[in-house]
Amino acid sequence: MRLSKQKIRSNYDSAAKYYDFALLLYGIIGIRKAYRLRAVKLLRLQRGDCVVELGCGTGLNFPPIIERIGPEGRLIGVDLSPRMLACAGERVERAGWKNVELIRSDIAAYNFPEGVNGVLSTGVFGYIADYDDVIKAASHALVPGGRLAIMDGKRPEHLPSLVFNLIVRLSRSFGVTRDYFDNRTWESVERYFRETAFEQMYGGMIYISSGTAA
């Protein structure tokens, strides 16, 4: 059963202060930071690009994005949780970045700006019932040749059920249920984008779906 948006926001508000540490614990069981970095790399960003990160959380993906787009680029972080955004704001302030904008919004209701070069999301789309509409909107917002990359989870084909069940249990504080892994976002990416790619890792539980806007 999927949680309401209000419940998801409440869960992440409560988890905001220890979220980064929790992701380190996921690394211990093999869910690696490298997966997120791979998604960023697939955007093929250049200096001066405009990037939208959907579900930016505490801003963990900001450093590799800023490294690529430089100070002349623009990064927009969108998240539903005000406390997660507050943590992201602290990260931005510590780093001294002047080209980052943080927006509190339901991702399904977010209006993309014009002239976007890259759209990134890691560990978010399983919450979004209207994911097809969001991916379609992203395809329209991206400039021709702009890139989308989504890293998320799905039902694994080659991961022992014991491990899958353990991860679901560990993720309950973030509002993750078994239903989270049922969204087939890659099919929407293939519908609205060209030059699509679908990569699987961690026994098929983690995937990265990417594509280029027409």
Question: Which sequence ranges carry the predicted segments?
Answer:
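Conserved class I S-adenosyl-L-methionine
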Residues: 1-44, 60-64, 87, 164-172
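C-terminal alpha-helical "lid/dimerization" subdomain adjacent to the S-adenosyl-L-methionine
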Residues: 6, 23-25, 149-203
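Glycine-centered, small-residue-biased loops immediately flanking beta-strands
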Residues: 49, 73, 146
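Class I SAM-dependent methyltransferase SAM/SAH-binding core
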Residues: 52-109
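Helix-to-beta-strand junctions that scaffold the AdoMet/dcAdoMet cofactor pocket
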Residues: 70, 128-129, 142-143
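A short acidic, Gly/Pro-enriched loop at the edge of an enzyme's catalytic core
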Residues: 108-119
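A short SAM/SAH-binding and catalytic strip from SAM-dependent methyltransferases
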Residues: 118-130
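A short glycine-rich, Lys/Arg-flanked "PGG" loop and its adjoining helix->strand segment in the class I
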Residues: 132-144
